[in-house]
């Protein structure tokens, strides 16, 4: 079991939680980004720097992740692809992306994108909050407890 992070847009607070968790739980954590990432020195944490371009980091995560892995991303199309491979997604606000819910979430995302393009709806998600950070921490802990107890 490994944790992959779509790191370019991942909030700093979430990365810090992931660093501490990877070292405490001794779980492999890989941040994938198209820019340099400053990470703590740990045998459990590394980075993969990909080239610039649309979906380059996403494609690398899809290529490398395996069934049972956890992918941290707010990118719903990426979450759909990794769920198809048997991985689970977790967004920085603590929402899990699973086989049971990803198609509905993807449909809602596509609808909202159309409404924004038509000018019917404006704006995006609220700013990342302390409650989001707590929700993320709780879901991460639950997922790891379930996954690591199966090993």
Swiss-Prot record:
Pfam families: DUF188
Domain of life: Bacteria
Assigned protein family: Belongs to the UPF0178 family.
Species: Maridesulfovibrio salexigens (strain ATCC 14822 / DSM 2638 / NCIMB 8403 / VKM B-1763) (Desulfovibrio salexigens)
Lineage per the UniProt record: Bacteria, Pseudomonadati, Thermodesulfobacteriota, Desulfovibrionia, Desulfovibrionales
InterPro entries (UniProt xref): UPF0178
Name of this chain's protein: UPF0178 protein Desal_2673
